[in-house]
From Swiss-Prot:
It comes from Hordeum vulgare (Barley). PANTHER family: SERINE CARBOXYPEPTIDASE-LIKE 29, SERINE PROTEASE FAMILY S10 SERINE CARBOXYPEPTIDASE. Signal peptide: none annotated. Glycans are attached at residue 107. GO terms for biological process: proteolysis. This is Serine carboxypeptidase II-2.
Amino acid sequence: VPRVPGQAFDASFAHYAGYVTVSEDRGAALFYWFFEAAHDPASKPLLLWLNGGPGCSSIAFGVGEEVGPFHVNADGKGVHMNPYSWNQVANILFLDSPVGVGYSYSNTSADILSNGDERTAKDSLVFLTKWLERFPQYKEREFYLTGESYAGHYVPQLAQAIKRHHEATGDKSINLKGYMVGNALTDDFHDHYGIFQYMWTTGLISDQTYKLLNIFCDFESFVHTSPQCDKILDIASTEAGNIDSYSIFTPTCHSSFASSRNKVVKRLRSVGKMGEQYDPCTEKHSIVYFNLHEVQKALHVNPVIGKSKWETCSEVINTNWKDCERSVLHIYHELIQYGLRIWMFSGDTDAVIPVTSTRYSIDALKLPTVTPWHAWYDDDGEVGGWTQGYKGLNFVTVRGAGHEVPLHRPKQALTLIKSFLAGRPMPVLSDLRSDM
């Protein structure tokens, strides 16, 4: 991609966009946008970023407003450089997954109605294997998976598929070293329990509703809730009012576009429909930009796809999601045995997959503590959040961030990815003093 429309600056790095066919039979192809590292890409690791949903585009969120180098302008007609882009530290690959999300497609129409966890992991593994044939310089390069929200399923499931593929075939071209997930759907029981507790302790819902949620919704699947649970979720949404459940202390986007999304837990299963801060309407800007014909042409989008309206999140995929594991904790146990670097992080103002949910899920893993709970500090010497190290897993909170941590706290998110990739703890005050 030489340039994208509305790019009024020169980029110091190369970037590529296009498709990889993951099934000839189904005519299924996944869309990617790949950014080389800004400096010395040959020495930097490869990173895959996935957004959640299920049904949300990593191009819309990951590139357009979170960790990508190009963020969409408020007029939806151009892009500006993100000073905290993660391609400062890695070569970063964004994938629209599964088929039917963003610019990804399938010629088999039934595919869009039959997506689920298992096929998503299989297709993503095929994607990576074929993508590395196209970019062979990244074969055996240190490789990490990252993502947020429903990627709490995608990422560990894909990591498991990669490790099992290694064992079955001896193919080591995907050199997976670890993964990191944020505000991640992990375990339905602990996630629900943590959400209801968070909503109650932050004063969003009444005592009575809190009790009813725990009775009727705790043991529910995230994707398939019962009518009884739905009814109480509606009450909880009404009580909480018109706030952004993805970032409970910041203003909502005041436009017709935003009205449905601010219903707290109205649709818990849309765990990837991101909240957006500072400019609470960032998602709206992406809708304008990625529907522009000239943008689609620059990104080599299939012209047939360009004829239908591009969406940040697909309601059709979300409502027709087939298999959804109730818990991925058993996968964590398996992957910890492989010695992978595993980090979880939480923006602490998200009510959709809040910090409490992740803490309950980690507690259920019963891992011994290696480094006790303590504050970590950003470059300005302010508390960036809190962290605890376990045997096989590291947990980090990001103070004041919502569901999309890199959108709300971009500087702190860059510190987070730097620490993760270096395999070192989050900085403490003494680190900052020694740097002065």
